A protein has these predicted regions:
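Active-site-proximal, structured, solvent-exposed surfaces of multi-pass membrane proteins
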Residues: 71, 80, 128-228
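Extracytoplasmic
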Residues: 1-151, 174
Length: 228
């Protein structure tokens, strides 16, 4: 593959983000060759990610592109030349939200994404919400009794380390909160810790990961440690 002008422009940004090429499909190998695309480089995509593409991304749902941290969108002009559009509204690698909505099924979870304010809200389907509510009752760090969270203007979370099998973040929030991570949720293999203590990972927004985070400043890590 030869990089286009748009590719060269995007590659100057060395932060962590995703790129979406409007003319391509989710498995666009060219985009994945140069950038971290929403589909990745492998043809075998997680089924839920393909469904998200078909039902949301293909319909230009900007909120979903934002939650996937799509910072650059590659488009073509009338002459067929590619150009990169900067998406200033991308949610980033991780963010605190103010509210979780519970729905009854995966289908309803997908439908909720039609109008979800992904920067401030999350949606969890019933199967996952039962796990979530159970852990709220049994997790001693939790003082949460509902699904709304105070998010002060200084609340922050930043990505410190990014490797395929190890992610590290620093969070700071004066209130206990809930963080959505722009990383695909996988049921098996990934473990999350907050200050070294294992914490349950929730499946939010159909394809992403969520964590309940205590008040204060914390080191959060995800490690891929499959059981052999």
């Amino acid at each position: 593959f030869q990089p286009s002008t748009a590719d060269m422009q995007i590659l100057q940004d060395t932060t962590h983000y995703r790129v979406f090429e409007v003319a391509g499909n989710m498995s666009n190998a060219r985009t994945s060759y140069f950038h971290k695309s929403i589909g990745g480089y492998h043809a075998a995509k997680p089924r839920k990610m393909q469904q998200l593409f078909d039902y949301q991304i293909a319909k230009n749902n900007v909120g979903v592109l934002n939650m996937l941290n799509v910072k650059y969108i590659i488009q073509s002009n009338e002459q067929g030349q590619q150009f990169a559009m900067n998406n200033a509204f991308a949610n980033g690698n991780a963010w605190f939200i103010e509210k979780i909505k519970f729905v009854n099924s995966a289908d309803e979870e997908m439908k909720a994404l039609d109008s979800l304010d992904t920067k401030n809200e999350g949606v969890i389907s019933k199967e996952n919400s039962e796990i979530y509510l159970h852990s709220l009752r049994t997790n001693p760090i939790s003082k949460l009794t509902n699904t709304e969270f105070k998010k002060d203007s200084l609340a922050s979370i930043k990505l410190d380390l990014y490797k395929p099998n190890h992610l590290k973040y620093t969070s700071n929030n004066s209130n206990e909160g809930f963080v959505v991570f722009s990383e695909m949720y996988y049921k098996n293999g990934w473990k999350a810790t907050i200050e070294g203590k294992e914490s349950p990972i929730y499946n939010v927004n159909y394809v992403l990961r969520g964590l309940q985070v205590p008040a204060g400043k914390h080191t959060i890590e995800f490690k891929f440690e499959p059981e052999v």
